[in-house]
């Protein structure tokens, strides 16, 4: 076959695939997905061990899902590696032509960006198919849907930080008038990402200066899953927690003396979204479940087990808090653009500098 014939054949195949995708995109309805989902029954899901409240929360989600759609769905859950590793795994599976290991993928902007760039996500007209899903919820249009909103912020123990000395922003942490209260006692996260994203508000030089001052007064490093050490009083304050408001609500419900405050305005925010990877074993059930997680009954389960919710679902804890406190969140598009630009030499150098500062 000549090169021209090969080209024409390839173009014809690509055209046929695009037509097929367009028809599939247009053909989905709630009714057709429910009918197809009833034949699939099992939703395979790999994520962090405590995702959606662990087994108890997932059981509640199964019950609410089946009640809404008249299905007999079961979540076949397995704990897996971190979100970056799971994204890389799905991309490799898709490129090899295999079925992916999880029907759905949960990740924030950075993790979903990895999948988006590799064209690893199913195209689904969520807002067009499901009446309760809005276009605003599609963080990556026709690919991902917001499941819960996680504003970043400072957390501290109110029994150990006097009210008149309490920080109201990240800059207060290194203010010479306030910092003696926690100098040599403050915990900071070991991650570069929260500082790198802070540059969207501050610029790189201001972030590096802040990081140096913060490290100079720090007492140690805490991961985002270790906020209990603030509750216990081992550290009186933590410079940043990736899900600060949800953590505060969770611990306050247990009687813990924890307060969360935003570090910047607008607040640096992680938008955790669900998507359906290409080659999913149970694609109809997966699409239905992604949309279901934005319903009030699904959000109630998240709030019950994790104190998490979407600010875009009316009546949720996050929705009410942000509206009543008049707090503004960083635009998803702003942080998405940051990740979709990829790792420039300048960006990699900046992160390398931050990593070096954190190790001091």
Where are these regions (language model features)?
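Bacterial N-terminal signal peptides that target proteins for export
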Residues: 1-11, 18-19
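Extracytoplasmic "Venus flytrap"
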Residues: 25-30, 40-60, 272
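Extracytoplasmic ligand-binding site segments that recognize negatively charged/polar headgroups
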Residues: 46-63, 76-91, 98-235
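Extracytoplasmic/periplasmic substrate-binding proteins
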Residues: 202-207, 217-279, 314-326
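Mature extracytoplasmic/periplasmic domains
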Residues: 267-268, 272-337
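Conserved C-terminal helix/tail region of periplasmic/extracytoplasmic solute-binding proteins
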Residues: 331-360
